[in-house]
Amino acid sequence: MWSYAVHGAVWLVLYLLFILAPLFVLLAGTLPPARDFWTEFAVALGYSGLAMMGLQFGLTARFRFVTRPWGEDVIYHFHRQISLIAVGLVFAHPLIIFAAQPELLARPEDGSVPLGALAAVASIGALALLVVTALWRVRLKIGYELWHASHIVLALVAVGGGIVHMVGWSFYLEDPRKRALWIGLVALWIALLLYVRVVKPLFMLRRPYRIAEVRAERGDTTTLVMRPDGHAGFRFSPGQFGWLTLWGSPFKITGHPFSFSPSAEAAGGRVEMSIRNLGDFTSAIHQVPVGQRVYLDGS
């Protein structure tokens, strides 16, 4: 228990360092001309919000050594809550700047709009759609697959737009150390995205499972019994959940999260998932044929 607490504390400190690093670096090196307090405060909120948004790729990468101290359900709850905080910071950024410098709302005489401004509008618009669809997906009757795909696209637009906006204005990027920090952060975010969408599916492709049994349960629930195909499987903790890719390759954008239902000590690497029919994807679970190849991400 003590080792888990230390492990968790270390990751929490590292997370805070990544979030606060842009603010610390703002004070280092060559400083641009000073501006009023509210403008600088708004810029600090924008930098922090962008850093938090980028690190969401890490929270959703499902690294076992990161999720182990808390559990994946806690990590995803944290992802949801911290995302709302990041969105609040990003939304506050332009509101405070325009309140402090209303002249910025005036359009240039030649009618052109700077690329940084267009990128900011795209980023904030994507964030607004992302929040609305995440909080009210069920009420809006958006299917899980469509929501998950759009969630990824909107997140990429939001973060990408924020980066272009930052580079477009580049007020604090003249100093080499500041540029180096943001180049490093962006490279980290891209690496995390590639890990989730390329590297991890490659590992899953080499470690498939086969449906060994499809068992009907009470309450319109079906249990899928799966056994590793050509490998020893993986160990999981009681209550842990994994992502099931049932029809398609592990490179498919959407995996469906379900809890593992058997004991973590099940023989032969066997895993089971008891899935209740809630419509959409789950309505066809009982039709899965024995012997079908599936992919599990439980790491």
Where are these regions (language model features)?
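Detector for methionine-enriched segments
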Residues: M1, M52-M53, M166, M204, ...
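Membrane-embedded alpha-helical bundles of multi-pass integral membrane proteins
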Residues: W2-L194
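A generic short-segment signal for beta-strand/edge and adjacent turn/coil regions
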Residues: L20-P22, R35-D36, Q56, G125-L127, ...
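Intrinsically disordered, low-complexity segments enriched in polar/charged residues with Gly/Pro
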Residues: F37-T39, A44, T60-R62, V132-A134, ...
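Hydrophobic alpha-helical transmembrane segments in integral membrane proteins
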Residues: S170, E174, L193-R210
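Short, structured interface segments
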Residues: V186-V198, Q292-G298
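Ferredoxin-reductase
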Residues: F203-D297
